[in-house]
Amino acid sequence: MPPYTVVYFPVRGRCAALRMLLADQGQSWKEEVVTVETWQEGSLKASCLYGQLPKFQDGDLTLYQSNTILRHLGRTLGLYGKDQQEAALVDMVNDGVEDLRCKYISLIYTNYEAGKDDYVKALPGQLKPFETLLSQNQGGKTFIVGDQISFADYNLLDLLLIHEVLAPGCLDAFPLLSAYVGRLSARPKLKAFLASPEYVNLPINGNGKQ
């Protein structure tokens, strides 16, 4: 039986990054898919620590909060930088990803029709810090921090992929980010996962907007 279990809705959502991480690292995991009907029934929601998913099980350890799960996997699988300085930078990147993801989620679920144009106009300013970070790390030719992949890379990759769907061409003005997406997406195990039905057939969000 796989050591990991992901309990989540049938969407990519906040689990896409951790699934990419597990697939790329050659880890197996079990999916427990929660339908809207099951969630609305209420008992599962009541059992969740914060009343929300994802829920993640690593043996007898149960975790909630998607970024906590990513950090846990970062620590246990060696994806948290090579020293404390790199770990701090990885945290900084991941917090920046979370800031933009929250804005994206707010747009998708509360203000898509009225707010999309303004969101897309402001997007270059939101993406620029990540281009800057890449430029400061070995000329942008490796990862977002250091010379080995971290959990923040998977989270940033997912963030960039969903924004390419929302605003095609949004990375055209950011050559390092554009190359970064291509480079990470071409990693053999990750490439296979991104082409798999388990990824392709899942909607990005739960309301059909993207």
Swiss-Prot record:
Gene Ontology biological-process entries: animal organ regeneration; cellular response to cell-matrix adhesion; cellular response to epidermal growth factor stimulus; cellular response to glucocorticoid stimulus; cellular response to insulin stimulus; cellular response to lipopolysaccharide; central nervous system development; common myeloid progenitor cell proliferation
Residues recorded with modification Phosphotyrosine: Y4, Y199
SUPFAM superfamilies the UniProt entry points to: GST C-terminal domain-like, Thioredoxin-like
Record-listed N6-succinyllysine modification sites: K103, K116
Record GO cellular component, one term: extracellular space
Domain GST N-terminal: 2-81
Record PTM N6-acetyllysine, positions in chain: K128
Modified positions (Phosphothreonine) in chain numbering: T62
Name of protein: Glutathione S-transferase P
Species this chain originates from: Homo sapiens
